[in-house]
A protein has these predicted regions:
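Cleavable N-terminal signal peptides of Sec/SRP-targeted secreted and luminal proteins
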Residues: 10-18, 59, 67-85
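Conserved H-D interstitial segment of serine endopeptidase catalytic domains
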Residues: 80, 91-93, 111, 129-132, ...
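Active-site substrate-binding loop(s) of clan PA
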Residues: 154, 166-170, 187-230
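Extracellular trypsin-like serine protease catalytic domains
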Residues: 28, 108-114, 210-324
Length: 324
């Protein structure tokens, strides 16, 4: 695979490397929009300025910039608060959609690292927030509940430190088992601004063609800033085969939910990771990933962790103090 010494700068935002040499390097923006590839590896390189994400591809044909069969690695230079999980959904807001009615979603949590929004979360009990495992920070995190406008110190807000991070034990930094519980240092005070969202009573499969709610404070577009107010959008569930065609082995049909969106109704983007997918008023998923820098591209399905699959794990973790 690729090594750090093989990386070469090809733009201010990207480095590239190949395992078999490069015949010609082009600026990343010159790559075809619909580049037929198979995602094969992703590296995390921890440095003083945050995590660097490298995504490697094996092209299915001889491209203008490589020899046939070479491996390309694209290194995304991103600060930790905007850490991207394949897509950037992990530091994300809603593309399109609309501003939520203030405090209409009292279960929404903003996970903050160094006082900056990094991920979404869902309050599921007064002492637990559910989110994505890839949202785990390298240092202390604070959960902000009862918020609408993150620029303000609203009286409705409750800021509670995370006492313990409890990611799934099988999460390895890839895309499966991407679920985590946050044990709060203090119990949240339940009121009209802060209220847990119930988990499904029993596991059920999620049907295709369902319109589902998503919400978050993430980016409003690939090159746009984070939203400071809570936004919401609508995503529509797709057959698992649609995601399997694009994401290959990285899409686990039992563990994940596949969705699409239109730009008017909105969809997830960087910073929305860990937020909810709510179908028929029931919590069904956790925002996980989509294509890097392509959160507003409807060619690439969005992926959510399937809560139904992990219900036994969630309940066991919350009921057993020694586990979380």
């Amino acid at each position: 695979m690729c090594s750090i010494r093989n990386f070469q700068m090809i733009s201010q935002l990207f480095l590239a490397c190949t395992s078999k040499g490069v015949s010609e390097l082009e600026h990343i923006s010159h790559l075809p929009t619909k580049f037929p590839f198979e995602l094969v590896h992703r590296l995390t390189i921890k440095g003083g300025t945050g995590d660097l994400k490298a995504i490697c591809f094996i092209p299915s044909f001889s491209a203008i910039m490589i020899h046939t069969g070479a491996i390309i690695c694209i290194l995304l230079l991103v600060p930790l608060p905007e850490f991207l999980h394949l897509s950037g959904a992990s530091g994300s807001s809603i593309v399109g959609g609309k501003v939520s009615k203030p405090h209409s979603k009292p279960y929404m949590a903003s996970l903050q690292y160094q006082e900056k929004h990094s991920c979404g979360g869902i309050l599921i009990r007064k002492d637990f927030v559910l989110t994505a495992a890839h949202c785990k920070a390298q240092g202390d995190m604070t959960v902000v509940l009862g918020a609408h406008d993150l620029r303000k110190k609203e009286k409705s807000q409750q800021r509670i430190k995370v006492a313990k991070f409890c990611p799934h034990s099988s999460f390895s930094g890839k895309f499966d088992f991407d679920i985590m519980l946050l044990k709060l240092q203090n119990n949240a005070t339940k009121n009209k601004y802060v209220k847990p969202l119930d988990l499904p009573k029993k596991a059920k499969s999620v049907s295709d063609k369902l319109n589902c709610l998503v919400a978050g404070w993430g980016k409003t577009g690939p090159n746009e800033p984070d939203s400071k107010v809570l936004k919401e959008g609508t995503e529509r569930t797709l057959p698992n085969t649609d995601c399997e065609k694009i994401w290959g082995d990285h899409f686990k049909s039992q563990q994940m939910i596949c969705t699409t969106f239109n730009k008017k109704d909105g969809g997830i983007c960087q910073g929305d990771s860990g937020g909810p997918l709510i179908c028929k008023k029931k919590l069904q998923g956790i925002t996980a990933f989509t294509a890097s820098g392509q959160c507003d591209n409807t060619l690439y399905p969005h992926v959510f962790t399937n809560i139904n699959y992990f219900l036994p794990w969630i309940k066991e973790m919350m009921q057993t103090k020694s586990l979380c």
